């Protein structure tokens, strides 16, 4: 198995070259190692950077799986690592409480480096806090469960609302595929769901580009799409959780995070399927359902998102009318966001401002609309492959999965666009008066 200090770049674009889209993209993660020698290479990295007292951040589970071994390895190299372990085995959230706990500890610490040992929650909490404090951090993944390892944004939950917050990408990633392969199978399924969700995210990005002229980058788009197709084609092997299979999945997830870092937002990897997941997280925070793994939620939502996109974009070339102004929320919509009216209003105001500022780009003829549809065709073409792969990963299409009944699913794909200002197919259908059909 290969050690990747610089993983393959599908675009053949070096990290700081000017792209054909006109931007200069920077991949912040300079070192990515996915190899059975990952912890040895982490220690060598720390020695090169003259670590004396690294702080190792983990939770009760990841401490047992790998964190203690990391501390031992750093100690044997002559360092004096500090241990910060969240005691939770279940239910840890990237919220105000977790941020405060880690921030307080690091402010009082003399640590000269921060190492996050864990998956989604540990990584997001650490990247958010280190960004607040102007510190760097290194990521040591313990599962191929999410795409945020290389990302420069953090998925946080403040006041019960999921928000994408500015943060930093890790300066390096060190992952041992044999550790990743021992993660619970549901975490691997979650990673598959999170990565396959990029299929609908890319259609949403192309749709907004065609309708409103939102900036898009073919290179960044490919950086997500190519690993996505590879994983969709090899889901059965990945579910066997061999080191080779989980390495393939983790590479795809890291590439997705790199793509987000290249454009500075989660747009290449997050569309209405992620908005649905965030909506379900909000319901869980309100006690309306149980929390569920992010990637499983994303994968489940992707089934419905792909169907909506094909319905909206796969028909005849009929030029749509300009979307009607977004009016006051009805009682039904408000009932799903009790206590969060201010946040929802801010999101919708931002979205309306985006639409108003770009209305000149709207396709006013059938021929222009046909170009918009054609622009999404390549992204839409992999929908059958992705839908089949999701089913193989035991992420079904039936109501009841993840404690989500028909009424909640119906509300999700009518109101989840209130969660984020990003334009998606849900906004398109709502603007055309088609969402309730």
Q: Which stretches of residues belong to each language-model region?
A:
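ATP/NTP phosphate-donor binding region
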Residues: 2-113
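C-terminal charged capping/lid subdomain of soluble metabolic enzymes
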Residues: 2-19, 315-437
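Solvent-exposed alpha-helices and their adjacent loops that cap or buttress functional pockets
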Residues: 24-26, 49, 106-109, 130, ...
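N-terminal low-complexity or amphipathic/hydrophobic leaders
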Residues: 36, 49-63, 187-191, 405, ...
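Gly/Ser/Thr-rich loops at beta-strand to alpha-helix junctions
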Residues: 60-66, 118-124, 145, 272
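A short, small-residue-rich loop immediately preceding and capping a beta-strand
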Residues: 106-143
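A glycine/threonine-rich phosphate-anchoring loop and its flanking beta-alpha core
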Residues: 131-230
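A conserved active-site cap/scaffold subdomain adjacent to cofactor or substrate pockets
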Residues: 226-236, 242-311
């Amino acid at each position: 198995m290969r050690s990747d200090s610089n993983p393959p770049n599908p675009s053949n674009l070096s990290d700081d070259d000017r792209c054909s889209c006109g931007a200069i993209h920077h991949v912040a993660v300079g070192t990515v190692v996915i190899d059975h020698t990952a912890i040895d290479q982490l220690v060598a990295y720390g020695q090169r950077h003259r670590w004396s007292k690294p702080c190792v951040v983990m939770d009760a589970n990841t401490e047992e799986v790998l964190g203690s071994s990391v501390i031992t390895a750093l100690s044997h190299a002559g360092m004096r690592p500090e241990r910060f372990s969240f005691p939770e085995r279940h239910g840890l959230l990237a919220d105000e409480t977790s941020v405060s706990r880690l921030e307080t500890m690091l402010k009082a610490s003399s640590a000269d480096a921060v190492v996050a040992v864990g998956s989604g929650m540990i990584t997001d909490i650490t990247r958010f806090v280190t960004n607040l404090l102007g510190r760097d951090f290194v990521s040591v993944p313990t599962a191929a469960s999410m795409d945020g390892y290389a990302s420069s944004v953090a998925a946080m939950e403040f006041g019960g609302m999921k928000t994408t917050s500015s943060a930093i990408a890790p300066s390096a990633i060190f992952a041992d595929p044999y550790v990743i392969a021992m993660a619970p199978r549901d975490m691997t399924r979650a990673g598959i769901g999170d990565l396959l969700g990029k299929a609908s995210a890319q259609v949403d990005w192309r749709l907004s580009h065609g309708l409103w002229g939102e900036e898009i980058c073919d290179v960044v788009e490919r950086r997500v799409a190519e690993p996505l197709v590879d994983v969709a084609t090899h889901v059965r092997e990945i579910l066997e959780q061999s080191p080779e299979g989980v390495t393939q999945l983790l590479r795809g997830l890291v590439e997705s995070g790199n793509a987000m870092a290249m454009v500075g937002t989660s747009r290449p990897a997050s569309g209405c399927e992620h908005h649905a997941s965030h909506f379900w997280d909000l319901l869980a925070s309100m006690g309306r359902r149980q929390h569920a793994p992010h990637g499983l939620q994303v994968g489940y939502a992707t089934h419905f998102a792909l169907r909506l996109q094909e319905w909206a974009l796969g028909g005849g070339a009929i030029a749509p009318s300009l979307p009607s102004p977004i009016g006051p929320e009805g009682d039904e919509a408000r009932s799903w966001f009790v206590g969060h009216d201010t946040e929802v209003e801010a999101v919708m105001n931002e979205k309306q401002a985006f639409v108003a500022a770009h209305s000149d780009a709207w396709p006013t003829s059938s021929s222009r609309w046909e170009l918009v549809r054609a622009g999404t065709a390549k992204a839409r073409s992999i929908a059958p492959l992705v839908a089949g792969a999701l089913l193989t990963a035991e992420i079904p299409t039936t109501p009841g999965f993840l404690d989500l009944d028909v009424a909640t699913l119906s509300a999700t794909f009518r109101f989840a666009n209130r969660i984020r200002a990003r334009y998606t197919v849900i906004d398109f259908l709502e603007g055309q008066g088609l969402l309730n059909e």
